[in-house]
A protein has these predicted regions:
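Terminal leader/tail segments of proteins
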Residues: 1-116
């Protein structure tokens, strides 16, 4: 499986998190490890983002101009929290992806950019 360099940005109204990673590319997914041992999978055919670490597993499904349900699993409590995701836009050019969405009046931008 090929590895490529990517710039990842997760931005909300009060914070911008940015990191550069080496990601594994498959025919429909980008997978990378964040600095805090969070493993992230983004399925770019189905627009599903999964971020998982020891404490949480977050699964967000995006559908352009639609509202979808996402889940946040709190592993220690064995509880699952449902969240409503309002996807404003999805832009994709090869492995460069930008998703603008809202969760409970909080505005987010998730960006994956291939570094050349």
């Amino acid at each position: 499986m090929p590895k490529k360099d990517f710039s990842i940005t997760i931005e909300n109204d009060s914070n911008i998190n940015h990191l550069n990673v080496k990601a594994i590319i498959t025919e429909n997914e980008i997978k990378y490890k964040e600095s805090d041992d969070t493993i992230t999978h983004f399925n770019y055919e189905k627009n599903i983002l999964i971020r998982e670490n020891k404490e949480l597993k977050m699964t967000y499904r995006f559908s352009k101009n639609n509202k979808t349900e996402g889940t946040i699993e709190v592993k220690e409590l064995q509880k699952e929290i449902k969240v409503l995701i309002d996807t404003k836009s999805i832009k994709r050019n090869n492995y460069n992806i930008e998703i603008v969405f809202e969760i409970e009046d909080n505005h987010f931008i998730y960006r994956i950019e291939e570094l050349v």
